[in-house]
């Protein structure tokens, strides 16, 4: 979904965007070298994503409103001897959450599942599973936002959500549950939820794989409506 007044400026660069992304109002996207946005990305309004030096936004990233992510810095006049002309690739890894009003400098890498608290100004790389805040931003020791969830527990959650989805949307949805798989069936559409990818893939079935968060899509009606139900904060899966 690309909302009102979003501007995408492509200046000889590559622009790539995946599935199930939301870009809110008045956001500016620039691709001079490259700008790559993968799947399940949410970008708040009035944000800036600068791909002048190359910018990669990976799966499941959340970017709060009025945030800016840069990949270049340039000012002053060459004729006067200014040497500030930097373009470096910036990378935001999977499932990073950048809260509102954050600034990310050029050439920065933010590791998997790290979180930038409100108003952070980041000038250095951040490792995976870290929380950072402040200006200049620094890591906050001892603060964790995730807990370990077993694959068995994940399957129970998916079963609970399947049942909830049926009660809200489709009373005639058929749900079949066994130890390793959950099957959803509505008319000719079928979804398989499994811990691991089955050895045999049935054509025209949608598969949600728990172990690697991947899904094999068919773009069926049931797939789209079920994934829309999950997508916000229940579970997200990535299509390759």
Q: In which residue ranges do the predicted regions lie?
A:
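Terminal amphipathic alpha-helical/low-complexity segments used for targeting or macromolecular assembly
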Residues: 135-240
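Residues that flank catalytic or metal-binding motifs in active/ligand-binding sites
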Residues: 65, 118, 128
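Contiguous mid-protein beta-loop-alpha structural module that forms a pocket-lining wall or clamp
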Residues: 122-129, 136-140
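Flexible, glycine/small-residue-enriched loop-and-beta-strand segment within the central core
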Residues: 1-109, 135-136, 141-145
């Amino acid at each position: 979904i690309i909302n009102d007044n979003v501007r995408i400026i492509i200046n000889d660069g590559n622009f790539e965007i995946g599935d199930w992304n939301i870009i809110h109002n008045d956001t500016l996207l620039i691709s001079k070298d490259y700008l790559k946005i993968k799947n399940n990305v949410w970008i708040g309004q009035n944000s800036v994503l600068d791909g002048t030096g190359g910018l990669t936004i990976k799966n499941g990233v959340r970017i709060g409103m009025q945030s800016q992510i840069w990949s270049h810095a340039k000012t002053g006049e060459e004729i006067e001897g200014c040497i500030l002309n930097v373009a470096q690739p910036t990378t935001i890894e999977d499932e990073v959450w950048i809260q509102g009003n954050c600034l990310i400098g050029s050439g920065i890498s933010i590791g998997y599942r790290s979180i930038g608290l409100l108003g952070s100004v980041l000038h250095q790389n951040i490792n995976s599973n870290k929380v950072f805040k402040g200006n200049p931003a620094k890591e906050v020791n001892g603060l964790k936002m995730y807990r370990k969830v077993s694959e068995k527990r994940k399957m129970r959650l998916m079963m609970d959500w399947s049942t909830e989805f049926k009660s809200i949307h489709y009373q005639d949805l058929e749900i079949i549950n066994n130890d390793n798989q959950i099957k959803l069936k509505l008319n000719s559409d079928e979804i398989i939820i499994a811990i691991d990818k089955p050895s045999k893939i049935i054509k025209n079935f949608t598969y949600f794989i728990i172990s690697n968060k991947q899904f094999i899509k068919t773009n069926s009606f049931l797939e789209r409506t079920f994934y829309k139900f999950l997508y916000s904060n229940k579970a997200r899966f990535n299509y390759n």
